[in-house]
Amino acid sequence: MRALHKELGNAVDVVRFKWLEAKIAQGHGELGSAEAAFCEVRDFFVERGISHDVAQVSLDLGTLYLRQGRIPELKKLTTDILALFVNLGIGREAIAALVLFQQAVEMEKVSFGLIRDLAVYLKNARNNPHLPFRPSSRA
């Protein structure tokens, strides 16, 4: 399947397929290979300035870090995402959502629910930059 995808797809499609493979690896507990793939995918999107995908894959990586209790790495990751969004001039609402997330990480109060809510929000905010972030009460 991967060979066919590489043959028929463009570079972004191939990287998105790798991202999917990373999610599957994470689900199967192959955390080392998942982390390496998430980082590779993230670097690809950073190089091309595809900010929302950088944030999404970073949140996947953040979930992995949280699951492993790697809070220092999660803190650095959130700082990097926020800096990228500020540098790219991403909408105020998305930046405000990321600041809230960063504060939760810094206070070590972040949850899987908050990461999930932020991922859903960023996906929706991509086409509606004025959409406010409202985390669920279970986050």
What are these regions (language model features)?
Residues 2-6, 25, 38, 45, ...:
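Eukaryotic all-alpha helical interaction scaffolds
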Residues 40, 47-139:
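C-terminal non-catalytic interaction modules
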Residues 12-54:
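Alpha-helical adaptor scaffolds
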Residues 2, 32, 42, 81-82:
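Intrinsically disordered, low-complexity coil segments
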Residues 1-7, 12-24, 101-109:
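Alpha-helical scaffold segments of alpha-solenoid architecture
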